[in-house]
């Protein structure tokens, strides 16, 4: 059983949307969202290299993942993953609180 830990950075409202997401992707960052439970949804960014490394293991899709956002740790499961149609790199990730 592998333990997955991803480091994320919270995004402000000015870093959300189509243009901002494209700028993040050019900087090798993946926009993501954490939602569910009693807490409000949190928009975050994850390093592309870190996410791709975790995706290499099939257990990533089945197990609870720890996402560190600042000093807070969220236990989540991946809900959806959007990939680029030609490059197959992750473009956006949805995480649901476990």
Swiss-Prot record:
Region (Disordered), start-end ranges: 1-22
One Pfam family this sequence matches: Ribosomal_L25p
Keyword RNA-binding: yes
The entry's keywords: Ribonucleoprotein, Ribosomal protein, RNA-binding, rRNA-binding
InterPro entries tied to this protein: Rbsml_bL25/Gln-tRNA_synth_N, Ribosomal_bL25/Gln-tRNA_synth, Ribosomal_bL25_short, Ribosomal_L25_dom, Ribosomal_uL5_bac-type
GO molecular function: 5S rRNA binding; structural constituent of ribosome
UniProt keyword annotation of Iron present: no
Cross-referenced Gene3D superfamilies: Ribosomal Protein L25, Chain P
Entry's Gene Ontology BP terms: translation
GO CC entries: cytosolic large ribosomal subunit
Domain of life: Bacteria
Matching NCBIfam families: PRK05943.1
Subunit organization: Part of the 50S ribosomal subunit; part of the 5S rRNA/L5/L18/L25 subcomplex. Contacts the 5S rRNA. Binds to the 5S rRNA independently of L5 and L18.
Family: Belongs to the bacterial ribosomal protein bL25 family.
Function field: This is one of the proteins that binds to the 5S RNA in the ribosome where it forms part of the central protuberance.
PANTHER family: RIBOSOMAL PROTEIN L25/GLN-TRNA SYNTHETASE, ANTI-CODON-BINDING DOMAIN-CONTAINING PROTEIN, RIBOSOMAL PROTEIN L25_GLN-TRNA SYNTHETASE, ANTI-CODON-BINDING DOMAIN-CONTAINING PROTEIN
Record's protein name: Large ribosomal subunit protein bL25
Gene name of this polypeptide: rplY
């Amino acid at each position: 059983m592998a333990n997955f830990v991803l480091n994320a950075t919270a995004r402000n409202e000015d870093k959300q949307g189509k243009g901002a997401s494209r700028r993040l992707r050019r900087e090798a960052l993946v926009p993501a969202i954490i939602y569910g439970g009693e807490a409000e949804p949190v928009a975050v960014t994850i390093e592309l290299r870190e996410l791709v490394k975790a995706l290499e293991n099939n257990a990533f899709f089945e197990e609870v993942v720890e996402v560190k956002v600042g000093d807070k740790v969220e236990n989540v499961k991946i809900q959806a993953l959007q990939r680029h149609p030609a490059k197959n790199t992750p473009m956006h990730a949805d995480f649901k609180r476990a």
